């Protein structure tokens, strides 16, 4: 399992940051988790029996869900904008 490349990570941070040098806002954290989740999803199509990494994937999905719940309670407009931008819900 490889982490998100540094250049790709900085692109995601720049795209979802609310201010300069913003790496901790829920939007940035959710976006980074989403990129890692998408990469792992591709990995599991080829390696169906990799249960150890699947546990890590489930932890990431759970953490993303918690961050989204926090953002939804804090600011519903930001939540909806993030969901739409990432394409997470239908």
Swiss-Prot record:
Belongs to the universal ribosomal protein uS15 family. This is Small ribosomal subunit protein uS15. Part of the 30S ribosomal subunit. Forms a bridge to the 50S subunit in the 70S ribosome, contacting the 23S rRNA. GO terms for biological process: translation. GO terms for molecular function: rRNA binding; structural constituent of ribosome. CDD domains: Ribosomal_S15p_S13e. NCBIfam families: S15_bact. The keyword Ribosomal protein applies. InterPro entries: Ribosomal_uS15, Ribosomal_uS15_bac-type, uS15_NS1_RNA-bd_sf. SMART domains: Ribosomal_S15 (SM01387). GO terms for cellular component: cytosolic small ribosomal subunit. It comes from the Bacteria. One of the primary rRNA binding proteins, it binds directly to 16S rRNA where it helps nucleate assembly of the platform of the 30S subunit by binding and bridging several RNA helices of the 16S rRNA. Forms an intersubunit bridge (bridge B4) with the 23S rRNA of the 50S subunit in the ribosome. The keyword Kinase does not apply. It comes from Paraburkholderia xenovorans (strain LB400). Disulfide bonds: none annotated. Keywords: Ribonucleoprotein, Ribosomal protein, RNA-binding, rRNA-binding. The gene is rpsO. HAMAP family: Ribosomal_uS15_B. Pfam families: Ribosomal_S15.
């Amino acid at each position: 399992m490889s982490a998100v490349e540094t250049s790709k990570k900085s692109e995601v941070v720049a795209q979802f940051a609310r201010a300069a040098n913003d790496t901790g806002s829920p939007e940035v954290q959710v976006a980074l988790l989403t990129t890692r989740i998408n990469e792992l999803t591709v990995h599991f199509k080829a390696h169906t029996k990799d249960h150890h990494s699947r546990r890590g994937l489930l932890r990431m999905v759970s953490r993303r869900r918690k961050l989204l719940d926090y953002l939804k309670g804090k600011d519903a407009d930001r939540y909806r904008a993030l969901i739409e931008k990432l394409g997470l819900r239908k």
